[in-house]
Each structure stands twice: as C-alpha cells, then as structure tokens.
C-alpha cells in the first residue's frame, strides 16, 4: 500500500490530538491555522477539516469558526467489543478479526471482551464487570453480542443495553436482538436474516424428501435461535410434522431415543453445526443411518461441518461481511446519534453435503 495522501495523514494527526484532549476547551483550528501548522495550501486545509467534519469530531459555523462537536469533546478513539462465543464457537473468530481490521482502518482501537465461561454465574458477573470497565476506560461505542444459555438472559442483556444508553454510549447488537421476536429493541442490529435462513434450510429438506421435520434446540438461547426455529416451521408448513421444536441435548442418548420414537422424524435441523455434529454421533449409536433414515442439517458452516461423517449440510454465515458491517454501522451511529434504528440482515448461503443428500445424488447436483 502506498503512502497516505497528505491531507489524510494530517487529518489523522489532528484526529489523534482531539482524542488526546489537546483541544478540550472546545475551540478548534481555523483554515488559516491549519495552513500555518502544516505549511500547506488552503485547498488541502479545507480537505483536512472536511475529513474531521465527516468523522463527526468538529463542526464549522460560518462567521463563528470551527469547534469540537460533542463527540469531539469526549472522543476516545476506542470501540468496545463484547462477545460470548470465542472459546466454543469458531464462527466468531473471523467476525472478530474483521471487526478489529475495520476499526483499525477507521482510526479506532478495539477493546476486546470475551465473556464465555462454562460457569453461568461467572459469565454474568464477567459481562457486567466488562460493561463497567469499558465505561471507566472510555469508549466511543460498543458492539455487543447478547449473552445466552443463562437464566434470565433477556433481562441481563436489557440491563447491559440500558447501562450503555444511560452513559450516552452508542450500542450496536451483533448476531441477535435482545428482544424476543416479533418485538424489536431500540438498538441497531447486524446479523444474518435468521428467519429466512431457517426457511431456506427447511425448503431444502422438503426438496430432499423430508416430510417429518424436527428443530432441535435448547432453552435460554438467544432470540435469533427462535427466529431460525420460526423460519424452519414456516418452511415446513403443510408437512405431517412441520418443524416441531424439541428441547434436548444432542448427545443425550435417552432423550434422542425418545424423540425418535415419539416424533418419527425423517429430518432434524439443529440450531448450529456443533450440535448437529454431536447429534450425528448419537444417531450412529442408536443405529440410525444418515441421510437414509434421518437427514441432519446445521447452521453456520464452521470447520466441524466439513469433518463429520457424513459431512453436514448447513447455512454459511458471511463472517467478514458481518464484521465490516457492524463497525460501519457503529461509526455512523457514533457520528450521528439521532439516526433512526436500523437492522441490517445479511444473506446466508446453503451448503449441501451428504448429511441430507446421498453421495451418489450429490455428485449429480454439483
């Protein structure tokens, strides 16, 4: 990559000076002062100031001068990220990487907070500590993946959102809303279109010959999991068993045996690939052939989906696009807090493998 254009380089210097508090009294440099400071012409000085206006750090008032905006007076150049899944879901590694890169390209540093923990009580304590730490350190905005798999997760997530809102810190939600559908929280959201994803997977199962479809899930999951469940049910509408939700652990031999006997499914959609991989092992122990006896599908397309026997049919999440979009949305919110609430729902691609279509037929499809 070549050397940055001069005006961008000098704008970056002034941006950092603002965030250090060098202009804390509120007044900022005029065009003439920028020209003298850097020994540049008026056109370049105007471009520098326009960059800072675009960042939301300064305002220019005709006849009055140039001043720091409210954001400029309090800017830290830091964005906080709170995720719950890095130690048990590889899906968020590329998302977090893209978030970090996008922050860096936009002139922000990233404060990373991973609240994953096997202990439910510790997970809640950890995320609440992170909230206070971010507020103490000073952040311009926060990207928050709502916590799940804990009792009263919705209440905890709403408490976290209210804390940031009360402190005047913009918040963008990652992957899931904090409100249960069909309700919508007052916060920006970036995720895949979970309902459409569930519906598309269900349509594939129908086309593969399934007529009795089960959606295997757990309690205390994020609202997005319920959206997937709803999508599967909509896609299975009219079938003898139209996407019935079953709450069970995929490696619970007795529970899966009861489900097979009671519901007689010929297809099982799991809320993610790891759960589907565990289910494949359980079905093998119960003597069920996949996909001949039962078709199995997951969501996310993490590495294990390609390594299972048979490989898993799944829905691939656009991780890099998610990461880049959530940073873009947050920076826009930081610069303009009065924007209307936005939901960016991204597309997800169906990846067909041998857990739903026999190898001989799959070759004909490719």
Protein language model features and the residues they cover:
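Amphipathic helical "hinge" segments at domain boundaries
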Residues: 8, 12-13, 20, 72-144, ...
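Flexible loop/turn connectors
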Residues: 17, 186-187, 257-366
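Beta-hairpin "wing" of winged helix-turn-helix
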Residues: 27-28, 55-63, 67-69
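Flexible loop/hinge segments that line or gate small-molecule binding clefts
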Residues: 147-197, 274, 300-312
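Hydrophobic alpha-helical segments within soluble ligand-binding/sensing domains
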Residues: 177-180, 184-215, 251-257, 276, ...
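An alpha-beta-alpha
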Residues: 199-239, 342-356
